[in-house]
Structure formats: C-alpha cells, structure tokens
C-alpha cells in the first residue's frame, strides 16, 4: 500500500447527508441496484476517456483494453469494482463525492415525500448512483487517478456514510477508479461470484464494454490454486447496434434505466436504423414519469450522442425540439465528425435533417401509444401534457400531428379530466357543425359553470374546457384541426352558423331592435368600463356576461403578463345582456337613472366575477349591493 500524504477529513454537504440517509432507507428493498449504479458510472468514465483521448491519445497510457472488473473477497467481506476510464483527481473526488453540485438540488429535496417507491424514483432520476453503495456497505473506499496526471497524484477517499469523509494523496500506477465496498453485517450474499454474475446479467448486460469477473476455479486436492483468470460476463456490445429482433423487452428496459438514471420502466420506445443519404441509429424512450425539473429551462435535457459508436456528449439538445425535452435516448451518427461541439451541432444542416426525422419518430410513437394503450397515454398526458402544449408554437411543421395528441376536458364529462382528443370531439360534433368550440378559464369549476356555455348546453353542443395557464397562449397558435377552425365562445360576437335556424336568427334580430334604447341607457351608465353593450345570443339563464373583443387579450394571458411585470395592453370588455331575464326586464322598466346606474354596475361586476376576473373597485360593488338589499328589505 502506498504512503498517504496530505490527509484531511472533510464534512459532507448537507444535501449529501440527507441523501445518504434516504438511500439507506428508501432503496433498501432493492439493494442489488448498487452494482448497476456503480457499473453505470464506470461505463460513463470509460466513455469520457475514449472521447478525451481522441484529441489527447497520450491519456490512454499504453492502450490497455478498456473494461470494468468486479471482484470479491468472501473472508474480508468486500466487493471491488474497478475501471480504467478517465479517473478522478483529488479535486474531482472532493467535488463529486462530497457535494451535489447540481442546479435543482433544493427542488429535488423538496419533492421527497417519505414514500419509498416515489422517493426511489426521484433519487435514481437525480443521478446520485455512487451513494447507493452505502445501501450494502458500512464503509466505502475509492482509489482513483485521473488520466494524464502522474502516478504520485492518485487519491484515496474513504467514508462510513455518516457525516464526513477522509481524502488523501497516494501513488497509483494505473489510471482509473477502484471502489472497495466493505459489506455490512448480513450483506455477505454479495461477496459471491454467482450472485454478482446474475446481477450483472440482469441489469448491465447492455453495457457496451466488457464487464469481467474472476473465473470460478477450484484447486484440485494437493495442488496450488490456479492463477486468477478473468472472464467477460456481459454481451459487451452497444444495444442500439443490434437488430431489434434479437433484443428482449427487458434489455431495452434496463438500457433505459442506465441512460436515464431512472428506476422505473419506460412507457414506450422506438429503435430505428437509417441508411442512405444519412446514416444513423436511434433509440428513443418515453419515460413513465416527469422529472422533478421538467419546467426548469436550464435543466439538463437531450440525447446521448455517439459518433460511430464513440461517446461524444450527454444532453445533446439539438436533436429534438424543446417541447420533447422529456424524451431520453441515444443517437449514433456515421456522418458527424468526432470533434463535433455543441456550437457546431446548432448550425449543421445534417442535424436539422436528423432532428426533423427524430421528432416525427417520437410523435409517431406517441400516436401509437395513444391508439393502442389509451390508459398508458392517460398517464403520459398527466405527466407531460402541459409540455406537449408548447408544441404548436414551436413546431409549425408538425402542428396538426401535435394537435391530434392533445387532450382536453370538455362539457361531455363532469370530472374535469383531460381525456378528450380533437378527433373524439369531431366524431361527436353536431350535424352541420364546422367549428371546434372552446372556453378558457382559471379552474374547471369556474369554466364548467360559466354563463358562456348556456346556449351550447341548450343546443347540446360540446365545448372544450381549457384551464391550464398555457391554454390561451396555445390556442393563439392553434387555428384549426382537420379543416375545422377553433372558436373561443367568450370572444367576439358569437355566430353558431348552421347550428342556428334562420327563424332563430330572425327572432334574435327583432329582439335586438326592440332593445336598442336599453342598450344606449346601459352604455351611458357603464361609460368607460365597457367597449360595447349588446343583446346576447349566448345566454338562456343568466342576466349578463362579459365577452372579450375579437383582438383583445383574454383573462389568462392578461394575468400571465401582469405576473411577469410586463405591460398589459388596454382593453375593455363587451357587456352582453339577456333580454328575457327578469332582472333585465326590471332594469328596462326602472325610471330612476341613479338606481338604473347602480343596477347596471351590479350586473357588470357580477358578470366579471362569473368570468373569473377580480373587481377593480370591490368596495363600490359592496356599497351598491348593500343599498339594493336595504331597499328590498323595507
């Protein structure tokens, strides 16, 4: 053993302490995953070495075969995992093994619930595989040297997984990392060749470099123990390069867990090889659950990029649009250069062609999932629906395809579940209906009881109910689907087209003529509060509503702009009244202009509240209402 120098004891970052505690308690039921996680890290270290050695061949230090070795010592109760990858310097070890230098750490910690299954998913997703060693070990030692550093700059890290760790400088002849797990009492099962072999076959068969175990060889009686020989126990070939027919579902699932750092199986995947003008292979996965940082724009996203089976980068963002940022996978190109950079990726026309094809492949995969596994698609929509709604604005070429994948709540159901596709809606449309009607609002309770829906209920016309914050913005980009245009039922002067009979239209015009005087009186009373007053075609039960001008921003968009501190363009609502409602008839007969004004303002404020808006002067509303109540009680 080499002499240790510059030895120091350091404390773990607070988050690491919490994480170690959670690791040991949340993942205990599936403790064998520690080996999968450590092998996955070792594989990444070898990938990084391969890539760095393209420009600095001297890092290979003589060019021994790249591999991972797993060994054990029954007597000492240890399991050792060794790779000859990129290795770590003293600084790397302190940074990577003592702290979690990741954005989103606080969010991650907040999301932990104490529920074992949910937490294990989050922990895996956060990519903290090294700490899983403490599930089975009460002490972990790491011996490492970064490729390119002298042998005298090796490092030894050691911890019992409590509050601190020790780090020292050592001599280490070979580059790479060796991890020694000192097994806890009762975990001796892992110091066994057969058990380790089974775990490797189960979880890490897809790893594209050899994973070796010592050959089991017993000495004959009276003979010396044979020299240690190693044998490869995994396939050691890149999964995406193999024919689809040879790959089992379980292999696809384990590969997903390796690249996505997820503990759950994916919902779906698509494996494809393209030959011809462009040559590349892709393996794309739809996760079962959303990552905790899905809405953080700076969160890592993108595919693993390989060029001719050599790893080039993680999180290559240029191959898929932002609204598909949740997709995990691998793309392996024969056409790109090995020294490709992120900047080059953003400008390369080859990438544009690949992005277009990969985007279509993902959308096809989602269409298939929606058609063949509607229950699974429901789960997908709950997790990723809001992100998919970013699609029509970002990806004009696939707008119709994305629209077909969207799901909405509607007046057809009464639970607010977003399970209606646009194809479902059109299949149920009334004869002669050439529009898709929708209403946006802050909550399902608010929109489903909106007075704007009264005429639609009366005529049995389905209306989509949109309550996500992104919905009004989405609909500004979604103009039509399958040749049918979208109509906001709260906007402009509602025209039901063929769904209104000529008699109904004529009768409405006659009523509007007879109420011209009332229209003028209300307009005078409400003054600058409104842009227009008119007789409503939408109402059957309520006395009045506020409609939005054809070119004006809706309530949702106004609130989003206000919340972000942006200037909101001035706009005034249109006041529509129901001429047959008893309150409007009373208003029409009111002789006192003062009382007429009070009643008009009360109706206006009530219509604003029904639309989900806040009152500009709540005190004035209360004063008028109290005055009216006093008059009624006399």
UniProtKB/Swiss-Prot annotation:
Coiled coil: none annotated. GO terms for cellular component: cytoplasm. SUPFAM superfamilies: ATPase domain of HSP90 chaperone/DNA topoisomerase II/histidine kinase, HSP90 C-terminal domain, Ribosomal protein S5 domain 2-like. PROSITE patterns: HSP90 (PS00298). Belongs to the heat shock protein 90 family. Its main location: cytoplasm. One of its GO terms (molecular function) is ATP-dependent protein folding chaperone. Keywords: ATP-binding, Chaperone, Cytoplasm, Nucleotide-binding, Stress response. The keyword DNA-binding does not apply. It holds the Pfam family HSP90. Residues 343-559 are annotated as: B. It is found in: Cytoplasm. CDD domains: HATPase_Hsp90-like (cd16927). Molecular chaperone. Has ATPase activity. This is Chaperone protein HtpG. HAMAP family: HSP90.
